Curated annotation (Swiss-Prot):
Encoding gene, per UniProt annotation: dxr
Binding, NADPH: 15-18, 127, 129, 208
Keywords noted in UniProt: Isoprene biosynthesis, Manganese, Metal-binding, NADP, Oxidoreductase
Protein name: 1-deoxy-D-xylulose 5-phosphate reductoisomerase
Cofactor: Mg(2+); Mn(2+)
GO process terms (BP): isopentenyl diphosphate biosynthetic process, methylerythritol 4-phosphate pathway involved in terpenoid biosynthetic process
Organism: Bacteroides fragilis (strain ATCC 25285 / DSM 2151 / CCUG 4856 / JCM 11019 / LMG 10263 / NCTC 9343 / Onslow / VPI 2553 / EN-2)
Amino acid sequence: MNEIKKKQIAILGSTGSIGTQALQVIEEHPELYEVYALTANNKVDLLIAQARKFMPEAVVIANEEKYAQLKEALSDLPVKVYAGAAALCQIVESGPIDVVLTAMVGYAGLKPTMNAIRAGKAIALANKETLVVAGELINQLARQYRTPILPVDSEHSAVFQCLAGEVGNPIEKVILTASGGPFRTCTMEQLKTVTKVQALKHPNWEMGAKITIDSASMMNKGFEVIEAKWLFGVQPSQIEVVVHPQSVIHSMVQFEDGAIKAQLGMPDMRLPIQYAFSYPDRINSSFDRLDFSKCTNLTFEQPDTKRFRNLALAYESMYRGGNMPCIVNAANEVVVAAFLRDEISFLGMSDVIEHTMGQVSFVQTPTYDDYVATDAEARRIARELICK
């Protein structure tokens, strides 16, 4: 009997929330998956521990100042050690890699993802900013190189699963669910004084700091709307957000006959990660199962875009197109970092994003170089607005 060839997986951002959970999935299925490469930005100690445990072919630390420490710590192992942004982009092109999990945070994920697509690697996409910033470009590349993009976001994985077996059946509407975050019931007055400590307490999901703040401000949901447009080929008007505080229904698809398919489950990111790895197959897992006898109260409500303006700004950027979503992403990365440093208020983040949208040069059909220039200009303007 032939031995099953293990899928070789590269994890970009292995020390973050998604990356560490992906390693749990791999650990649970050592007969199916093998870690080929691990990368991190700064968390060198955790990267060292992961490398010693999973014995990848290579590791990359983006922060070059940490290279010597990483190299020394792994000197007794047959693991190649690299550092810097260029190495990050090159490692994804390695021949044996089957799947690249893009779990790094923010705009930094764009270039490595493009390189992985050009190298013909299946993309398990957890870095939503890649499609927010350059969705059209990424889709063109994926078509050109016949590379599958498998969504890892729980909402997009849910939609992806709902679309299984529906080839050729027109989508009427994609319905993305949102928990509403920790401030769902706060008044505008209360939102003026919320702190980063409060914002970092998400009611349902365990996530990294940046995405947790984005969830609190609903920018995360705005980005997911843009991501859905590119992943599923729907118009902005076909994407609806509904607040579902229990996070049991992960998203839904309504078809032209009015039928709605939904994907349900426990709020556990390992499930969509595993599905992206195993697609089109499903494999067993030890994850907690949903107990319907305990789901006695599933509720739904409309999002309030007056209190959570970021969602409206994301929709506006999607309707305007061009480099506008790139502008929003860059400004958002700057304001979230400032909020985490206590340099801007929670509501002030939306003000800076909106003003940045009005000041950065608009490009209707941007190239990759345009995106790079837009990102730099938007960050500069957002920082200037914060300092005013």
